């Protein structure tokens, strides 16, 4: 692999799921999707389902932190503001995603999630 190729990172678009090749030195500059122009590494928490979870996580080299949650879960709701704060703090360095375990049982099962919390 050439030095130029090694300096690029693949980032999945949270909007259209397209894989984007971004210069690693420019990750903090707010890169946008080449297909739909959506921000790739903003501070938002991305909500994914069974289908989009696999596509998103397989198309990105950026670390992804996943919150498997459920709307009826009190501790999950209590943690949500802290998860969002962490996403803002680490914007550009990691992607934070939420997966509703009730609506995405396949994604939850792949990671051994059997109960919430």
Can you annotate each of these PLM segments?
Residues 61, 68-72, 115:
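Short pre-active-site segment immediately N-terminal to redox-active cysteine/selenocysteine motifs
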């Amino acid at each position: 692999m050439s030095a130029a190729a090694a300096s690029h990172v693949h980032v999945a678009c949270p909007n259209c799921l397209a894989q984007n090749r971004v210069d690693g030195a420019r990750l903090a500059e707010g890169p946008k999707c080449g297909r739909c122009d959506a921000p790739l590494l903003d501070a938002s928490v991305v909500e994914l389902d069974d289908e989009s979870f696999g596509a998103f996580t397989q198309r990105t080299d950026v670390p992804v932190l996943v919150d498997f949650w459920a709307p009826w879960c009190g501790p999950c709701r209590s943690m949500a503001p802290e998860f969002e704060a962490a996403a803002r703090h680490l914007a550009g360095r990691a992607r934070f995603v939420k997966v509703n375990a009730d609506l995405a049982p396949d994604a939850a099962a792949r990671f051994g999630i059997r109960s919430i919390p």
